[in-house]
UniProtKB/Swiss-Prot annotation:
It is a peripheral membrane protein. Its cofactor is Mn(2+). Keywords: Cell inner membrane, Cell membrane, Hydrolase, Lipid A biosynthesis, Lipid biosynthesis, Lipid metabolism, Manganese, Membrane, Metal-binding. Pathway: Glycolipid biosynthesis; lipid IV(A) biosynthesis; lipid IV(A) from (3R)-3-hydroxytetradecanoyl-[acyl-carrier-protein] and UDP-N-acetyl-alpha-D-glucosamine: step 4/6. GO terms for biological process: lipid A biosynthetic process. Mn(2+) 1 binds at residues 8, 10, 41, 196. It is found in: Cell inner membrane. Disulfide bonds: none annotated. Belongs to the LpxH family. This is UDP-2,3-diacylglucosamine hydrolase. The gene is lpxH. Substrate binds at residues 78-79, 121, 159, 163, 166, 194.
Length: 239
């Protein structure tokens, strides 16, 4: 048996090829799987469950069918932090805290989206702190639909522009933040996404940090079993 981890699909109506590849993944890659974990940014943008796009609702029905065979767990990312219980229930996804510890075949593992580890990006961390307040999310959800969409589009545009000007180092995880999370969680293994830099980092103290990749040009999935970990790429034309 095996457990699969994915993240950073950034699904949108503008990139239905990614949605199609994800559907093929759901059809072909989950045989004998114990569970599927989605580590955030499943969608490029999410302004509220009441504004879910038609393609997202169709995907929710697909995920719900899959959830009849195996559990699907979801952790919010920085793009879909407004995804709520209403949509999660329709999709058959179980929402997890932003930092979750679990036993993966005998290995204590901490999983998260990963944006909280990029502590050198001070501007983003200020925004992240603001959106962490339940009142701020509630206030946003009370706005008219068009206003919410406009704000989301503005944030997305500003983020893309800002990221182009930020250095490689600032947009990666900060080693001290990684060390702190290992210490706080008492785990030997960490799995996250967000940085779009798939890799398996092994430390001299025996700890391991695994980064799942994005789905812009090809799929990325981490397969964990009792035999170890396998970070795989899935070409869109063959996934």
């Amino acid at each position: 048996m095996r457990t699969l981890f994915i993240g950073d699909l950034h699904l949108s109506a503008d990139r239905l090829d990614i949605t199609q590849a994800f559907n093929r993944f759901l059809d072909t890659e989950l045989d004998d799987a114990d569970a599927l974990y989605i580590l955030g940014d499943l969608f490029e943008v999410w302004v509220g469950d009441d504004l879910a796009a038609p393609f997202a609702l169709e995907l929710a029905r697909k995920l719900n069918q899959v959830s009849q065979r195996l559990p699907i767990y979801f952790i919010h990312g920085n793009r879909d932090f407004m995804l709520g219980k209403q949509f999660a229930d329709v999709a058959g996804m179980q929402m997890l805290p932003e930092v979750t510890c679990l036993d993966l075949y005998g290995v204590n593992t901490v999983i998260l989206h990963g944006d909280s580890l990029c502590t050198l990006d001070k501007a983003y961390q200020r925004f992240r702190k603001l959106r962490s307040f339940a009142f701020a999310r509630w206030l946003y959800s009370c706005l008219p639909k068009k206003k919410r969409q406009a704000i989301a589009n503005k944030i997305r545009s500003n983020s893309q522009s800002s990221n182009q000007q930020k250095s490689y180092v600032i947009m990666d995880v900060e080693p001290s933040a990684v060390d702190a999370l290992f210490a706080q969680s008492h785990c030997k293994q960490m799995i996250h996404g967000h940085t779009h830099r798939p890799a398996i980092h092994e430390f001299t103290n025996g700890c391991k940090r695994i980064v799942v990749g994005d789905w812009y040009e090809q799929g990325s999935v981490l397969v964990v079993s009792s035999d170890g970990v396998d970070l795989k790429s899935l070409p869109f034309d063959a996934s």
